[in-house]
Amino acid sequence: MQMMSLEKEAAMETKTAEQRSLDYRNAMARLGAAVNIVTTDGAAGRAGFAATAVCSVSDNPPTLLVCLNRNASAYKVVKANGVICINTLAAHHEVLSTLFGGKTPAEERFAAGSWGVLETGAPVLEDALVSFDCRIREAHDGGTHDILICTVVDMKINAGDEALMYFNRRYRVL
């Protein structure tokens, strides 16, 4: 039996970690989720990003969590402002989601759609299925992302029964 060199062993471990990461991303593509645009505004400026990693934590007090990639263009602005609005998208918002999910400059992102504000001042998409206006209460390290624990301070609920979903790397309507 031959002994493996330390370099070869390290290369195999790296490849294994890379493969595990790829396998995980492929598996997560099979987990359907609502599409949201998360926005912020305040002293650090206005920014927003598309997110599917959003879920309820508690109803007393009303609390949501959002996962924010540390490499996202909105990362520093969101963290500095300390407020967000989670806007859950309707079926007709696919183009808007694409704008907020890519490299489009913030000004162009917000030029699309009609925006208002609630208590925190974070942009509220006027025709979102629901908008959760939040203050960021805590942030936790989650690897490549921060896990933001957010207290809901106001909500806007609109009529509509077709949600924009993301499943298997494609938009779907539910």
From Swiss-Prot:
Keywords: Flavoprotein, FMN, NAD, Oxidoreductase. GO terms for molecular function: FMN binding; FMN reductase (NADH) activity; FMN reductase [NAD(P)H] activity; riboflavin reductase (NADPH) activity. The keyword Protein transport does not apply. It comes from the Bacteria. InterPro entries: Flavin_Rdtase-like_dom, NADH-dep_flavin_reductase, RutF, Split_barrel_FMN-bd. SMART domains: Flavin_Reduct. One of its GO terms (biological process) is uracil catabolic process. It catalyses: FMNH2 + NAD(+) = FMN + NADH + 2 H(+). Its EC number is 1.5.1.42. The keyword Metal-binding does not apply. PANTHER family: FLAVIN REDUCTASE (PTHR30466), FMN REDUCTASE (NADH) RUTF (PTHR30466:SF1). Catalyzes the reduction of FMN to FMNH2 which is used to reduce pyrimidine by RutA via the Rut pathway. Belongs to the non-flavoprotein flavin reductase family. RutF subfamily. This is FMN reductase (NADH) RutF.
